[in-house]
């Protein structure tokens, strides 16, 4: 094939050789990359696992410990002080001939947006479970996020050195709570010294780590004939049987062989890899990151079972050799300015290259860096499939798609549409990049608001600049200006989120801002349908502006805006230009952002346009303002009810403390869903409670339980309120409570 190509006409031999060499290099380079995320519930040991990977790969010379505050990936002051991950961080390290790009993500629910954006950059994930707790609340959240991105995954059961660890329960949790098909390729055991060892199901070996050299080396021992070996052989046979039902190649061998013992390890691994990449199974491994057990085999599994970049993201093949890169994070460096983390999906990014983001802005890459958390090594170019940090991008935001030019983007869009059979080659239409490539920019609703004030008037500009930079890093941070009070208002995902923002502004920007009291982000919904006509006529700068709109608000959880299709109104609406309808829609929907009672977003409400008469020469801005004014009038007429945010809590405490905790919860308007046994001495309470009643609840729970209880909390939607609670909420918002 190569000989034929070199002697075919139409292209100089040297140029063809260069192109073939570049293509072959890219393919082999890409096949040796693994882009992975590491996900977990808070305190499952995710960051410790990452630090061990860096140490054993030779990337770091000492073990980073969360409790010592010397980790590579948790480099923010707030992360090291609190012992939690707040921002996603990217690290690159070599392992057995491959290059692993790993994204360490937060485990706390307040920073779930960090996880969501990081998953756009990876091809597979490792989900870390606490061996003493199994699948927890945030485990379910991150698993659902991985499902959304269709990511192959491995499960790593950590803390298996602990006496209360339960491997079988963790595996059962994966099967029942996450509705997946776990495949155990390791089982825990103990050596004669009582230390954790691992039995490998595929090789039938016992793996023992050496504590004297910090787990750098481990021995493999073939199990002697015994009950342990017989049980492990049964597990191996079960694994082969399970995989043969999912993989045709393995099934053919099983059918033709006389015994499962004749099925080679390599054949099992290949079948398991195919099943994992197709998301049919989840391989389960185990270890203890803190005790330095099992990490090397976890990295081996990343290489063996998770996909290379070229096996994923085929939708971007439409770019050919042009650049396609997904922006998944932005950080601000004091010396280098904004640094943009990009997953290169196709093509090659070089230093000095000009790029276009999917929103149309032109950018120039001044420098490129290889990621290692907050340390950077400059490089000249980075190939498809890799992760890179770009300096010099000024307008790009998280979620943008970067490409070589607008022409390259348009051509890729059209090729993709043609491959889907939805557009002809010569059709010229405006295409939605986000919709076409499945880019979701949806930002979760804030659950808390508070005002933010600089220490002095002279610090106002610096504070606004700091907020702009933090908002570019963290899309879930909302910043707005309240025209009524004249205050800057922050919206965030929780108390911890807001506290971290204040702390970062002080530590990174040296501005000691003052945050006002936290306000609950209530929503509003209409009590009853209402219809009205608003006619406005004014003369502005000598031009007559004339608008008459008939609008209605109705209860509806679907579209925000619709047209009345009744015969008497349809003829009028058909005369309106699409642009005019869009202007009316934009003005109408904007009025739903601020309800009449507490300024909350109006939800479960649809605006219906019945009639519109617009005078010649009337400006779009005037039409938009009239539509907003009409909807505001309707909301006041119909009246609104308040909806309050509800949180789902999981509380684990000793059995003797449960009654006191439940009594306190009942005073907080909580709905107790279930009380389940949790081990021999503990119970777990599953409860929903209004966020307004949970201010400072962590401290209260510690007091009630004498420090023996633990809690996780995450948003669980909104719920209506009775008249008394509504009145209290209004007084709180007005600052009267």
From Swiss-Prot:
Residues 31-310 form the tr-type G domain. Keywords: GTP-binding, Mitochondrion, Nucleotide-binding, Protein biosynthesis, Transit peptide. Pfam families: EF-G_D2 (PF22042), EFG_C (PF00679), EFG_III (PF14492), GTP_EFTU (PF00009). PROSITE patterns: G_TR_1, G_TR_2. The keyword Protein biosynthesis applies. InterPro entries: EF-G-like_DII (IPR053905), EFG2 (IPR030851), EFG_II (IPR041095), EFG_III (IPR009022), EFG_III/V (IPR035647), EFG_V (IPR035649), EFG_V-like (IPR000640), G_TR_CS (IPR031157). It is found in: Mitochondrion. One of its GO terms (biological process) is ribosome disassembly. SUPFAM superfamilies: EF-G C-terminal domain-like (SSF54980), P-loop containing nucleoside triphosphate hydrolases (SSF52540), Ribosomal protein S5 domain 2-like (SSF54211), Translation proteins (SSF50447). Mitochondrial GTPase that mediates the disassembly of ribosomes from messenger RNA at the termination of mitochondrial protein biosynthesis. Not involved in the GTP-dependent ribosomal translocation step during translation elongation. This is Ribosome-releasing factor 2, mitochondrial. It comes from Drosophila pseudoobscura pseudoobscura (Fruit fly).
């Amino acid at each position: 094939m190569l000989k034929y190509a070199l002697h075919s006409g139409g292209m100089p031999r040297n140029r063809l050789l260069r192109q073939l060499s570049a293509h072959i290099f890219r393919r082999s380079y890409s096949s040796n990359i693994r882009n992975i995320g590491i996900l977990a519930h808070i305190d499952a040991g995710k960051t410790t696992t990452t630090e061990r990977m860096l140490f054993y790969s030779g990337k770091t010379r000492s073990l980073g410990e969360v409790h010592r505050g010397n980790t590579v990936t948790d480099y923010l002051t707030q992360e090291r002080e609190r012992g939690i991950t707040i921002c996603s961080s990217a690290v690159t390290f070599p392992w057995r001939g491959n290059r692993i790009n790993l994204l360490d993500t937060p485990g706390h629910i307040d920073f779930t947006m960090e996880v969501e954006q990081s998953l756009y950059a990876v091809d597979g994930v490792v989900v870390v479970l606490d061996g003493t707790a199994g699948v927890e609340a945030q485990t379910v959240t991150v698993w659902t996020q991985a499902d959304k991105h269709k990511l192959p995954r491995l499960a790593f059961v950590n803390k298996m050195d602990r006496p209360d660890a339960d491997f079988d329960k963790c595996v059962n949790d994966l099967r029942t709570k996450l509705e997946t098909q776990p495949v155990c390729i390791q089982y825990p055991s103990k050596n004669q010294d009582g230390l954790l060892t691992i039995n490998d199901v595929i090789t039938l070996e016992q793996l023992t780590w050496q504590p004297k050299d910090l787990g750098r080396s481990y021995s493999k021992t073939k199990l002697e004939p015994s009950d342990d070996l017989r049980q492990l052989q049964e597990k191996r046979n079960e694994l082969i049987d399970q995989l043969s039902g999912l993989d045709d190649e393995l099934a053919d061998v099983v059918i033709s062989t006389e015994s499962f013992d004749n099925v080679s390890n390599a054949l099992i691994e290949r079948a398991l890899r195919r099943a994992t990449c197709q998301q049919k199974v989840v391989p389960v491994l185990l270890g203890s990151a803190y005790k330095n057990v099992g990490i090397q085999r976890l990295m081996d599994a990343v290489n063996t079972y998770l996909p290379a970049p070229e096996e994923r993201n085929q939708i971007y093949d439409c770019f050919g050799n042009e650049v396609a890169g997904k922006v998944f994070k932005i950080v601000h460096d004091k010396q280098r300015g904004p640094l943009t983390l990009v997953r290169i999906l196709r093509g090659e990014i070089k230093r000095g290259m000009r790029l276009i983001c999917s929103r149309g802005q032109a950018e120039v890459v001044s420098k490129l860096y290889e990621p290692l958390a907050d340390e950077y090594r400059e490089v000249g170019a980075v190939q498809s499939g890799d992760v890179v940090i770009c300096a010099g991008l000024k307008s790009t935001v998280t979620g943008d798609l970067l490409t070589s030019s607008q022409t390259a983007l348009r051509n890729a869009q059209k090729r993709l549409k043609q491959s889907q059979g939805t557009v002809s080659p010569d059709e010229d239409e405006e295409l939605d990049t986000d919709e076409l490539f499945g880019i979701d920019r949806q930002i979760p609703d804030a659950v808390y608001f508070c005002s933010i004030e600089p220490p002095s008037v002279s610090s106002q500009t610096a504070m606004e600049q700091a907020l702009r930079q933090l908002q570019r890093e963290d899309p879930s941070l909302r910043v707005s200006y309240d025209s009524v009070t004249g205050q800057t208002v922050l919206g965030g995902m929780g108390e911890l989120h807001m506290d971290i923002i204040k702390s970062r502004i002080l530590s990174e920007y040296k501005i000691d801002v003052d945050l006002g009291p936290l306000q609950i982000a209530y929503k509003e919904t209409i009590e009853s349908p209402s219809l009205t006509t608003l006619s406005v006529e004014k003369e502005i700068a000598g031009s007559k502006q004339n608008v008459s709109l008939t609008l209605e608000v109705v209860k509806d959880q679907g579209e925000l805006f619709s047209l009345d299709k009744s015969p008497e109104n349809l003829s009028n609406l058909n005369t309106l230009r699409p642009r005019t309808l869009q202007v009316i829609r934009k003005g109408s929907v904007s009025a739903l952002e601020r309800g009449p009672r507490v300024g909350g977003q109006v939800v479960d409400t649809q605006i219906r346009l019945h009639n519109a008469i617009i005078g010649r020469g009337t400006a779009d801005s005037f039409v938009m303002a009239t539509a907003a004014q009409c909807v505001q009038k309707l909301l006041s007429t119909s009246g609104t009810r308040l909806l309050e945010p509800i949180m789902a809590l999981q509380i684990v405490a000793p059995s003797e403390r449960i009654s006191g905790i439940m009594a306190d919860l009942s005073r907080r308007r909580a709905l107790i869903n279930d009380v389940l046994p949790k081990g021999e001495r503990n119970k777990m309470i599953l409860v929903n409670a209004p966020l307004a009643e949970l201010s400072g609840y962590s401290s209260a729970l510690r007091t009630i339980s004498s420090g023996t209880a633990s809690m996780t909390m995450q948003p669980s939607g909104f719920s209506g309120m009775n008249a008394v609670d509504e009145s209290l909420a209004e007084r709180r918002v007005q600052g009267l409570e």
